[in-house]
Amino acid sequence: MARLNVLVYPDERLKIIAKPVVEVNDEIREIVDNMFETMYLEEGIGLAATQVNIHQRIITIDVEGTKENQYVLINPEIIDSCGETGIEEGCLSLPGFRGFVPRKEKVTIKALDRHGEEYTLSAEGLLAICIQHEIDHLNGIVFADYLSPLKRQRMKEKLLKLQKQLARQK
């Protein structure tokens, strides 16, 4: 397995809309394995392929971080949702920042697993929020897009400054 490079906002590649996976094969399973490896190393609970510059509809999730309840969502689609909720969300592509995002309390999705088998999943709580967050990434949306223009601009400026500082240290 390999650690993948996580794109950081305002990288324009985060705005690319991911394409559906045509065939779940060994190459896709390797991407999934590398995404889980990266997600755990970065201490995240979810990762969309878009965040690692792979523009296919693939998501990995483990909200508990135990590696016992891993979810692979290939070509995920929300087929039902209800209720209203929201929390201060964080994101590996927006390190050090959090923001409130309104979400559906419960979602039902259909997706393919790592073997290409279709399944349906009903989720609530943190898992439902994480699924919606990661599907947003596949659609070219980051949580900063839900914030006011002023907050988004401040976030962008701070992240660009941080990136410049890190580049000078290399």
UniProtKB/Swiss-Prot annotation:
Biological process terms in GO annotation: co-translational protein modification; translation
UniProtKB keywords: Hydrolase, Iron, Metal-binding, Protein biosynthesis
Positions annotated to bind Fe cation: C91, H133, H137
Molecular function, one GO term: metal ion binding
Reactions listed under catalytic activity: N-terminal N-formyl-L-methionyl-[peptide] + H2O = N-terminal L-methionyl-[peptide] + formate
Active site (record annotation): E134
PANTHER family assigned to the protein according to its UniProt record, in alphabetical order: PEPTIDE DEFORMYLASE (PTHR10458:SF21)
Name of the protein in its database record: Peptide deformylase
Species of provenance: Pasteurella multocida (strain Pm70)
